[in-house]
Amino acid sequence: MGRPKKNKKKNSRVKNSNLKKIIAGVDEVGRGSLIGPVYAAAVILDKSCNRKILKDSKILSKNQREILSKHIKKNSIWAIGKSSAKEIDKGNILQASLLAMKRAINKLNKKPTKILIDGDKLPKLKDFKMKAIIKGDQKIPEISAASIIAKVSRDKYVVSLARKYFKYSWDKNLGYATKEHLRAIKKHGINKHFRKSFAPIKK
């Protein structure tokens, strides 16, 4: 006598429920800076990563971000994507940000089953299930982790530029339009790292 059909359905449900969900969080940094690339990070957190300590990178101190960045990198799958100042000038900052996100996602060495992205726009990617979440960096640990890694990575790059272009104090303003930075631009002009499509650089 054969087994009842209901057992087959039950087994099917159990099998489906056991499918592992792989969630990736994605965020970008540096959109408002007057210089350099916009950075994006994609992060798949491991179970060993402490999600409770992950917060939006903007509300963390520099020291906190650097400590958390090391913790995240040690306990996750992650990747960085960038769009250069030239790419930003060629199109616009939104499209460049989405391109950086796309590059970060494509560099992950494991394919996520779902991608959660900070903001209200999605990059153009096939074969990925994606969802945009406004203020996701404040709500979703995976996105918070991405914001931290992206922020630390970009800040280190800008600080490295400041050693050569010390007149602009990029190690302090990180390329943003502070009064001191604008005065330095007026006095010394611009160089190849500036986003020429950005006000007040654009004339």
Name every feature range the model reports, one short phrase each:
Residues 1-203:
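RNase H-like, Mg2+-dependent phosphodiesterase core
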